[in-house]
Amino acid sequence: MTVLVVNSGSSSLKYAVVRPASGEFLADGIIEEIGSGAVPDHDAALRAAFDELAAAGLHLEDLDLKAVGHRMVHGGKTFYKPSVVDDELIAKARELSPLAPLHNPPAIKGIEVARKLLPDLPHIAVFDTAFFHDLPAPASTYAIDRELAETWHIKRYGFHGTSHEYVSQQAAIFLDRPLESLNQIVLHLGNGASASAVAGGKAVDTSMGLTPMEGLVMGTRSGDIDPGVIMYLWRTAGMSVDDIESMLNRRSGVLGLGGASDFRKLRELIESGDEHAKLAYDVYIHRLRKYIGAYMAVLGRTDVISFTAGVGENVPPVRRDALAGLGGLGIEIDDALNSAKSDEPRLISTPDSRVTVLVVPTNEELAIARACVGVV
């Protein structure tokens, strides 16, 4: 069985051809600059992906494709497991777009294009929020007017769930321990960033909330913020709700504080003596450390902390600084292991560390492909 996985963003489209059973990738790639002259829209992007596959000798009709798997960020209360795409699903996903304005609309465009170009295959939507569907009520409930929250379905949904679930499973496999026996903290640190507490393979808390804006400081998003700031900007600075939303989503985080959302560029600015970049980094690390400590308290006993995604996997100083001085909590990392590079799961804690610290590469495309297996 082979699955085509499509992860459609506003300006890029990632694709992969995967054999779920073996984990083999026949091909993968990314089409960037959607909206430019060369790639004017998502239709052109997916056609370009097909052209790349054909150039590599992989023709769709010869691949034994059984399904097309799509990443969808927000499933709300309606979608909490992989679901066959139909017109009703698309309509409901579109209704949820205000809760994930950077993610759901381009994902819907990708799905619509793929259904048009591959009409004879089942299309499966895999939702970022699904892993957190059963969060305990104390973790998922906001302390606001209960009737208002129930009427408008306001709760913590959580995001990056496909990655958090996959990494927690891979950590257990790497350690050769039963998933059910482990209490884990997973830190998905990319341009978007989130933390989760996972007990026995089940999520018990996570940092993102109703939308992907809450929680950790991110590349362009603020993370946790006093709601009073929003009202203050609206009343005093004359900003509209749309202006504030755009600022919090696109011009905040380390970009808003330090002038760069890419950590390589941020490190260059810090090394050049840029004080704003240094503050952005310090705020990022401070927030990350707070969540690590909070989730250790939530879990009671922490067995494993795993770093994943672009920053988590590839920026050793972030891992070092996030865990520095936490020996009293049983966390000690080995500098040499932390600095080593590898594309495989690896240990970075010392033999004396009571908490095992890992770097576990995420693989959302493989996880999405495997999620399709039980549906088709």
Swiss-Prot record:
Disulfide bonds: none annotated. Its EC number is 2.7.2.1. Mg(2+) binds at residues 7, 364. It is an enzyme of class 2 (transferase). Pathway: Metabolic intermediate biosynthesis; acetyl-CoA biosynthesis; acetyl-CoA from acetate: step 1/2. ATP binds at residues 14, 188-192, 262-264, 310-314. It is found in: Cytoplasm. SUPFAM superfamilies: Actin-like ATPase domain (SSF53067). Keywords: ATP-binding, Cytoplasm, Kinase, Magnesium, Metal-binding, Nucleotide-binding, Transferase. Its main location: cytoplasm. CDD domains: ASKHA_NBD_AcK_PK. GO terms for biological process: acetate metabolic process; acetyl-CoA biosynthetic process. Mg(2+). Can also accept Mn(2+). The active site is at residue 128. Its cofactor is Mg(2+); Mn(2+). It catalyses: acetate + ATP = acetyl phosphate + ADP. Substrate binds at residue 71. GO terms for cellular component: cytoplasm. The record marks 160, 221 as: Transition state stabilizer. It comes from the Bacteria. Homodimer. HAMAP family: Acetate_kinase. NCBIfam families: ackA. Catalyzes the formation of acetyl phosphate from acetate and ATP. Can also catalyze the reverse reaction. Belongs to the acetokinase family. This is Acetate kinase.
